[in-house]
């Protein structure tokens, strides 16, 4: 390795190395490599008995190689003449290429004259290798000349930063800053170009991070240096200036190392390196448990698997013992760890029983499935433990900062020091939780971003504290105030970046489940505080509820931006709007009234029931949002504890409960349906699969049309959605909990069917074709009939009886009838939509009009969906029923219309 220190520029370069570090060199070298390889491979089958002679193809290829090399020489000469750096090395490299080119030309000519000679082929291959090495070295030298140019610019910036830090007067400071800014901008452009060309992803990330720090911190160094000059007696300003200068030095080193594609001396230069350790360990463990029984050896596999599992359990135990982990969550993690241990022992026993066999037995396959399920359950509890931390820590993240700033503005240095400790602990907690979220995430790119953001937040924390201490020392100083505002803004911006990054690597389903439980806890604390007349506790807890609700709304709204607009997003956004526009204002009003009543002397009476109702509505609003978000999840994606097990156990212990029949006899009808025996569940699943086929037909039908001017399509979608909820109920899933909910849903379908009947008859009345008219009326009669059937079947009697010591669940026949009626209705709706369109076209042809012009019925093809500029990747998206806009296959209107050609026969 040669280190060139020209003008204190640390230029690391190994003259013997032919390692290609940039994409540009690869691109330039590729055509020549292809041509040389093609020439070398010409007639490569060895000696031939055919008549010897000249090879036209070889001569042509040799000429093309010669031409390509001449192009390199021409460019190389130009680079060597124009380059300010490595001039001698470049000239020598060009001459070496010219020499190797002549040798290659001679060897290729001889080979072309006698392509069957192995000796001449060998000579040409050696000449080709030497030529490629010479050209590669020339390109690498040219590349390093560019790097040297960047390092010279980097040295200018580094010197400028030092001059800015050491400026003795404000005038000198202004001059130095004005001179430095264009140099930093120039460096940023050069570094960005280099970043794009680097082959190694780690070096690209390192360059990007260093550029960001440089761009952000140069203006801050100017402000900090200015404050030092105006208030030389305030030590906090000097400390801040030195911290920022140190960060800039690290950024300069980072750019230098990344540009030369060398390893960093400091691990902190790679804040985004690595993935989720615990997630990786669990994934690796899941792979390790699958072994060929023929090669299984207990002595080899048992210690290895047990050691891996204990390492995972140690990581899980650390998470369980953390301060933010709830007691019930800690117990569940411990239980899952024990279950995983037991599952591993059972699996190893099965492997021992299968040792030496060619194929795995059913018992062994079951043990593997059980082991995988237990690790999946442990993952789920760890994810939710992380979400406990995220939900608590990333709540009202600006409060410690605002308190610190307020104390600084008042000039109270003692308070500032106290609040600085609180602020530091808060920052450390954010960083700790962010790293916890990383440990259980499989999103490698997301983890990099979180760790990079956390690293920058950690560096910013002492700077914010120093700015507050400086303001407390000079509270009247305008510069001190501006300095504080600058750091406050930087902190808030960085926290937002970290929050969004953490949200990207965590599951929205886990977030909503945990937020729902936390809000329920807080709601009950609020009620208790009200009953105990604890004003501070009431106000503080109510603030936490408002913060949690606002966070839920923000996260869910951001998530919906990733989906194409449709029924699903409309329902979710409708639930968020209800919470933000109606529920939360009412809750805030009740809290303010309660605080005012309790704070007055003497305390004024207030309506406790009103407060409890407002609090309950907050919980219900969060729950409704969560149910709306989960509507598109498949049963496999939903947690076992999503509704039943957590819901009823938790709510039965609380002081705030809804007064519906969901808790009568301890279980809802939906929960009872979930307890059906496997045989009966299989029968229902068969019916549901048949129903899903009809639903797919309806989805295909309505997706063709723009529903903005067509109430028939709108009604069809609504009926489909409600029928899906009803069939989900029969499987113990979905938002409908009891028979009363199902009956209510059936009534809604009947109302929609009645409206569709009215619209359909209007179309039929205008249709001149009697056959089409009769078909449409027949389908409308079917809708009325099946709506009536569905209404009858909706009265599902789900009961649990104890017969002979065995629990027997009734209601299967009713459930089967319900699904069958829904399937029949779905089919009738599909046929009605088709017949309505056909009848409309007949009317158009008869009257010679562009459209039917009926109110609320306009048949227009649905416009292609807009695609987002940036697609956010999500894991396990393949099973999602509603696809992302960027993934959805759009239907060709001409193709869609062609499907109606057969409809004339209806």
Curated annotation (Swiss-Prot):
Location (main, coarse): cytoplasm
Region: Disordered, residue numbers: 864-894
Residues that bear N-acetylthreonine: 2
Region (Involved in homodimerization): 2-228
Region entry Interaction with JUP and CTNNB1, spans: 97-148
A GO CC annotation given for this chain: adherens junction
GO molecular function: actin filament binding; beta-catenin binding; cadherin binding; structural molecule activity
Covalent cross-link Glycyl lysine isopeptide (Lys-Gly) (interchain with G-Cter in SUMO2), where: 57, 797
Amino acid composition bias (Basic and acidic residues), ranges on this chain: 864-880
Keyword Cell membrane assigned: yes
Membrane topology value: Peripheral membrane protein
Keyword check for Cell wall biogenesis/degradation: no
Region (Interaction with alpha-actinin): 325-394
Modifications the protein undergoes after translation, according to the UniProt entry: Sumoylated.
Example GO BP: negative regulation of protein localization to nucleus
Origin superkingdom: Eukaryota
Known function: Associates with the cytoplasmic domain of a variety of cadherins. The association of catenins to cadherins produces a complex which is linked to the actin filament network, and which seems to be of primary importance for cadherins cell-adhesion properties. Can associate with both E- and N-cadherins. Originally believed to be a stable component of E-cadherin/catenin adhesion complexes and to mediate the linkage of cadherins to the actin cytoskeleton at adherens junctions.
Self-association and partners: Monomer and homodimer; the monomer preferentially binds to CTNNB1 and the homodimer to actin. Component of an cadherin:catenin adhesion complex composed of at least of CDH26, beta-catenin/CTNNB1, alpha-catenin/CTNNA1 and p120 catenin/CTNND1. Possible component of an E-cadherin/ catenin adhesion complex together with E-cadherin/CDH1 and beta-catenin/CTNNB1 or gamma-catenin/JUP; the complex is located to adherens junctions. The stable association of CTNNA1 is controversial as CTNNA1 was shown not to bind to F-actin when assembled in the complex.
Record-stated family: Belongs to the vinculin/alpha-catenin family.
Descriptive protein name: Catenin alpha-1
Organism: Bos taurus
């Amino acid at each position: 390795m040669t280190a060139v220190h020209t003008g204190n520029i640390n230029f690391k370069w190994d003259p013997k190395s032919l390692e290609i570090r940039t994409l540009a060199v690869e691109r330039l070298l590729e055509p020549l490599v292809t041509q040389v390889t093609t020439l070398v491979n010409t007639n490569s089958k060895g000696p031939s008995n055919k008549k010897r002679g000249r090879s036209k193809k070889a001569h042509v290829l040799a000429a093309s190689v010669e031409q390509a090399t001449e192009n390199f020489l021409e460019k190389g000469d130009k680079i060597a003449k124009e380059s300010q750096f490595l001039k001698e090395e470049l000239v020598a490299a060009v001459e070496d290429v010219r020499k190797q080119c002549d040798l290659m030309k001679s060897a290729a000519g001889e080979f072309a004259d006698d392509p069957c000679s192995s000796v001449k082929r060998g000579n040409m291959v050696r000449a080709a290798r030497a030529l490629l090495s010479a050209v590669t070295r020339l390109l690498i030298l040219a590349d390093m000349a560019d790097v040297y140019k960047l390092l010279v610019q980097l040295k200018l910036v580094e010197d400028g930063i030092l001059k800015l830090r050491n400026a003795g007067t404000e005038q000198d400071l202004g001059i130095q800053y004005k001179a430095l800014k264009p140099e930093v901008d120039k460096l940023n452009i050069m570094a960005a170009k280099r970043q794009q060309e680097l082959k190694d992803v780690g070096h690209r990330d390192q360059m990007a991070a260093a550029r960001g720090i440089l761009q952000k911190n140069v203006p801050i160094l100017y402000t900090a240096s200015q404050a030092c000059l105006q208030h030389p007696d305030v030590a906090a300003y000097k400390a801040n200036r030195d911290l920022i200068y140190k960060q800039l030095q690290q950024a300069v080193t980072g750019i230098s190392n990344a540009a030369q594609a060398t390893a960093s001396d400091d691990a902190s230069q790679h804040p985004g390196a690595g993935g989720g350790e615990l997630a990786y360990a669990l994934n690796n463990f899941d792979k390790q448990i699958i072994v060929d029984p023929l090669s299984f050896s207990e002595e080899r596999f048992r210690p290895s698997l047990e050691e891996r599992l204990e390492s995972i359990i140690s990581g899980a135990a650390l998470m369980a013992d953390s301060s933010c982990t709830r007691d019930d969550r800690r117990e569940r993690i411990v239980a899952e760890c024990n279950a995983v241990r037991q599952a591993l022992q059972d699996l190893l026993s099965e492997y021992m029983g299968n040792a030496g066999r060619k194929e795995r037995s059913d018992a062994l396959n079951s043990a593997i499935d059980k082991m995988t399920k237990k690790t999946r359950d442990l993952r789920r509890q760890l994810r939710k433990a992380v979400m406990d931390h995220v939900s608590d820590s990333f709540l009202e993240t600006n409060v410690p900062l605002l308190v610190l700033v307020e104390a600084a503005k008042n000039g109270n240095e003692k308070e500032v020091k106290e609040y600085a400790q609180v602020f530091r602990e808060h920052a450390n907690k954010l960083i700790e939780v962010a790293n916890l979220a990383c440990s259980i995430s499989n999103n490698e790119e997301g983890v990099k971003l979180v760790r990079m953001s956390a690293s920058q937040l950690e560096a910013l924390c002492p700077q914010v504290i120093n700015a507050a201490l400086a303001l407390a020392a000079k509270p009247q100083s305008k510069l001190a105030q501006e300095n504080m505002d600058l750091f406050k803004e930087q902190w808030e911006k960085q926290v937002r970046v970290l929050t969004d990054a953490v949200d990207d690597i965590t599951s929205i389903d886990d977030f909503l489940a945990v937020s729902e439980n936390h809000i329920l806890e807080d709601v009950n604390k609020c009620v208790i505080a009200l009953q105990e007349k604890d004003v501070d506790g009431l106000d503080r807890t109510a603030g936490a509820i408002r913060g949690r609700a606002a966070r839920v709304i923000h996260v869910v709204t951001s998530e919906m931006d990733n989906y194409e607009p449709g029924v699903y997003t409309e329902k979710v956004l409708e639930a968020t709007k209800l919470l933000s526009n109606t529920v939360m204002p009412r809750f805030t009003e009740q809290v303010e009234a309660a605080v005012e009543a309790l704070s007055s002397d003497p305390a004024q009476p207030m309506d406790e029931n009103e407060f409890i109702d407002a609090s309950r509505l907050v919980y219900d609003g969060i729950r409704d949002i969560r149910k709306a978000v989960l509507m598109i999840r498949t049963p496999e994606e939903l947690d076992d504890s999503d509704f039943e097990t957590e819901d009823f156990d938790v709510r039965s212990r609380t002081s705030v409960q809804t007064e519906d029949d969901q808790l009568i006899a301890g279980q809802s009808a939906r929960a009872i349906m979930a307890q059906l025996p496997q045989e009966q569940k299989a029968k229902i699943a068969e019916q549901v699969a048949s129903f899903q086929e009809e639903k797919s037909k309806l989805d295909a039908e309505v997706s063709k049309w723009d529903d903005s001017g067509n109430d028939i399509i709108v009604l069809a979608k609504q009926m489909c959605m409600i029928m899906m909820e009803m069939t989900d109920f029969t499987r113990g899933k979905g938002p409908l909990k009891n028979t009363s909910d199902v009956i209510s849903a059936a009534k809604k379908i009947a109302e929609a069917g009645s409206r569709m009947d009215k619209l359909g008859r209007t179309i039929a009345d205008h249709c001149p074709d009697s056959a089409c008219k009769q078909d449409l009326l027949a389908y409308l009669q079917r809708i009325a009939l099946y709506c009536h059937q569905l209404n009858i079947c909706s009265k599902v009697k789900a009961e649990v009886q104890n017969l002979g010591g065995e629990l027997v669940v009734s209601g299967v026949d009713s459930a089967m009838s319900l699904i069958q009626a829904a399937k029949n209705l779905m089919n009738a709706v599909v046929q009605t939509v088709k017949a309505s369109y056909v009848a409309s076209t007949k009317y158009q042809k008869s009257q010679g009009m562009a459209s039917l012009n009926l109110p609320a019925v306009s048949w227009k093809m649905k416009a292609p969906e807009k695609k987002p500029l940036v697609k956010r990747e999500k894991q396990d998206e393949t099973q999602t029923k509603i696809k992302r806009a960027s993934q959805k296959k759009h239907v060709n209107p001409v193709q869609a219309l062609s499907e109606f050609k057969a409809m004339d026969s209806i």
